[in-house]
Amino acid sequence: HSNLNKLSNNEIIYKIKKANKSIQKNLNFNSDIFSYPYGESNLENEKIVKSLGFRIAFSQHSNHIYRGENIMRLPRFSFNEEFGKLDRFKMILESKALAVYDVIPKDTIINSSFIGMGFSTNHKLNSINCFHSNSVKLETFRIPPNRLEIRFLEPIKKGRNRIT
């Protein structure tokens, strides 16, 4: 499948409809559940997917689902050769969702150089640690009572970047 973030809206609609026709033909089944190719979505893609009749959609950021989650961008955990060890599976089973709100930036795909992000949560701020997937140095600010802001201390690289 193509990465939807690299396609025009018309191409996205065409590809999804084509895939649905293939599923219907081969499985005699219509699904109202969508999984973003490569696990990547943005606000515009989410609107398109919803307009095509999908009830929920899965992205690929790791978290448990919590009440109030964006149902067009639900998290899922990767399980494959690299991320499929039993110890990791046990850790996931024992962990809990980090419910967040007032997230900035609102979109998950950022096409410009930005210096940070933030969110609010009802969890204890001192129990939260943040890391960048490409070892970019960052600074975390805990703003009482429930706000966490992250600032990058060096430029982020082009391409896929994740904060965990």
Tell where the protein language model's regions lie, with residue ranges.
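Glycine-enriched alpha-helix->loop->beta-strand junction motifs that scaffold or abut catalytic
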Residues: K50-I56
